[in-house]
């Protein structure tokens, strides 16, 4: 337990250093939650190994979400931003035109030096693009919902569950792995992580619905033709699917499978008690912490 705490503190210090370079976009990022999560999912890894595995600050899923929700005003602007993100990820292009893009450029450059990255680059580019398509869907659906015209089919929503960014935030653990047999297990890991992505999306939606229902431009599964019971059933179904795929590898002592099971357990458990927002350095000190009283 003490070792995990030390790792979390080292990761937190690293994230704070990175956030200080881009205060325009990262000052409201809940970096404490990200540091704790990173250490909890991979407690046997050292802080140096996890430096690339805390990309919520670096490549921007959390700050990118914020920027898109708060600052993007047109679909053309959104498509331009996402196109530049893809150019960085797929082509290695450096882009300093915006702090988010500069941060992503630096992180991508470091990621490309990871041992398994060359063989995983194509998969990384495809899954990153899939996450951006999910973000785009959420943005357009939220805009339509503000006009009273939002989509209602929950299965359509789940098609874009990559907007949870669970896949792209976990990927660095594969790229930096020292396991020579990682690629042998990759098909199972990839399929399981896609199921986990849906579970994370649903558990996040359950945690954030009360906040998001009062905010413009939001898109949440509970805004569709669903109920909390339906969402919990789908969450359980996708969790079981991932567990059934991963259990044989985890039982055999394959660390990448264990990490995915820990990612699933940590995410669902955390979101069952709290929204990631509002209990760390991003907390509004004039209001309640948002942290569950038993944590």
Curated annotation (Swiss-Prot):
Q: What is its EC number?
A: 4.2.3.31
Classify the source by domain of life.
Bacteria
**Cofactor annotation comment:** Activity is highest with Mg(2+). Can also use Co(2+), Zn(2+) and Ni(2+).
Q: Enumerate the catalysed reactions.
A: ent-copalyl diphosphate = ent-pimara-9(11),15-diene + diphosphate
| Keyword field contains Lyase | yes
Q: How does activity depend on pH?
A: Optimum pH is 7.0.
The record's section on InterPro entries has: Isoprenoid_synthase_dom_sf
**Any GO MF annotation of the entry:** ent-pimara-9(11),15-diene synthase activity
**Could you say which protein family the record assigns here?**
Belongs to the terpene synthase family.
Subunit and partners: Monomer.
Q: What is this protein called?
A: Ent-pimara-9(11),15-diene synthase
> What organism is this sequence from?
Streptomyces sp. (strain KO-3988)
């Amino acid at each position: 337990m003490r070792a995990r705490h030390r790792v979390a503190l080292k990761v937190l210090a690293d994230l704070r250093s990175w956030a200080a370079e881009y205060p325009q976009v990262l000052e409201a990022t809940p970096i404490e939650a990200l540091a704790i999560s990173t250490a909890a999912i991979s407690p046997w890894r050292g802080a140096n190994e996890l430096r690339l595995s805390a990309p919520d600050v670096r490549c921007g899923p959390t700050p990118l979400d914020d920027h898109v929700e708060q600052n993007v005003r047109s679909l053309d602007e959104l498509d331009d931003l996402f196109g530049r993100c893809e150019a960085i990820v797929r082509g290695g292009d450096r882009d300093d035109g915006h702090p988010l893009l500069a941060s992503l450029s630096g992180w991508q450059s470091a990621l490309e030096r990871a041992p398994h990255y060359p063989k995983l680059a194509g998969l990384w580019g495809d899954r990153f693009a899939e996450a951006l398509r999910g973000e785009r869907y959420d943005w357009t659906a939220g805009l339509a919902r503000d006009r009273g015209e939002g989509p209602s089919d929950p299965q359509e929503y789940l098609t874009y569950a990559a907007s949870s960014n669970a896949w792209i935030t976990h990927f660095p653990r594969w790229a930096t792995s020292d396991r020579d047999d990682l690629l042998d297990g990759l098909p199972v890991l990839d399929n399981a992580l896609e199921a986990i992505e849906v579970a994370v999306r649903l558990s996040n939606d359950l945690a954030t619905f009360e906040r998001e229902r009062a905010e413009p431009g939001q898109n949440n599964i509970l805004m569709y033709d669903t109920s909390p019971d339906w969402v919990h059933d789908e969450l359980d179904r996708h969790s079981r699917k991932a567990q059934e795929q991963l259990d044989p590898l985890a039982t055999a002592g394959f660390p990448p499978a264990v990490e995915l099971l820990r990612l699933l357990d940590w995410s669902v458990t955390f979101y069952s008690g709290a929204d990631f927002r509002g209990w760390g350095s991003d907390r509004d000190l004039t209001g309640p912490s948002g942290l569950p009283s038993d944590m």
